[in-house]
């Protein structure tokens, strides 16, 4: 499918962008909350993984059913109930990548008219397949901004914890 090829490529690229941002973080860094009042990086990764499964389900249902109902999922309830800090970041990113690869294959196999198929979202109303794919792309990119900010805050915190004593010796502050 030529029409949606660029959209599918952008959709596929998201998982690798996330992987690059989190792959070198320690468990402690993933679970830290360097930005007051915000989720940890681990919570963001788990939220993205859970959301990815929902986005894929919605896309599949729009392709397979006539005007299916697409339910809203409350991210705060998912975060509270689904053990985000007990999960594994590498596994969660792999789930996102796997789901996106599967969906990309499905999307590439569709006719051009499939992009206009619709579902009825419980809060957002009518949504086309194209809008659902774009939402999945935008959602991940939106959260990458927060992951970058958390990384920056962690780096700044680490820099502030390094001090030099009077003899020129570097010491680490806790």
Residue ranges and their predicted role:
Residues 1-4, 82-89, 125-129:
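A short, mixed-charge helix-start or loop-turn motif at secondary-structure junctions
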Residues 1-11, 172:
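Terminal targeting/low-complexity segments that flank the catalytic cores of oxidoreductases
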Residues 4-8, 65, 104-106:
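A broad, low-specificity signal for short, low-complexity segments enriched in glycine/proline
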Residues 10-14, 19-21, 77-117, 136:
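Acidic/histidine-rich alpha-helical segments that form the ligand environment
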Residues 31-75, 104, 116-174:
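Short, contiguous alpha-helical
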């Amino acid at each position: 499918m030529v029409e949606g090829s660029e959209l599918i490529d952008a959709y596929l690229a998201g998982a690798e962008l996330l992987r690059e941002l989190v792959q070198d973080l320690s468990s402690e860094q993933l679970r830290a909350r360097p930005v007051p009042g915000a989720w940890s990086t681990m919570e963001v990764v788990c939220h993205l993984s859970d959301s990815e499964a929902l986005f894929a389900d919605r896309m599949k249902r729009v392709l397979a059913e006539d005007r299916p109902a697409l339910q809203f999922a409350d991210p705060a309830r998912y975060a509270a109930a689904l053990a985000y800090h007990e999960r594994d970041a590498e596994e969660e990113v792999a789930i996102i990548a796997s789901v996106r690869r599967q969906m990309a294959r499905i999307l590439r196999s569709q006719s051009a008219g499939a992009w206009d198929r619709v579902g009825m979202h419980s809060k957002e109303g009518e949504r086309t397949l194209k809008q659902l794919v774009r939402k999945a792309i935008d959602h991940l990119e939106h959260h990458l901004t927060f992951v970058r900010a958390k990384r920056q805050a962690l780096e700044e915190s680490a820099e502030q914890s390094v001090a030099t004593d009077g003899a020129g010796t570097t010491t680490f502050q806790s």
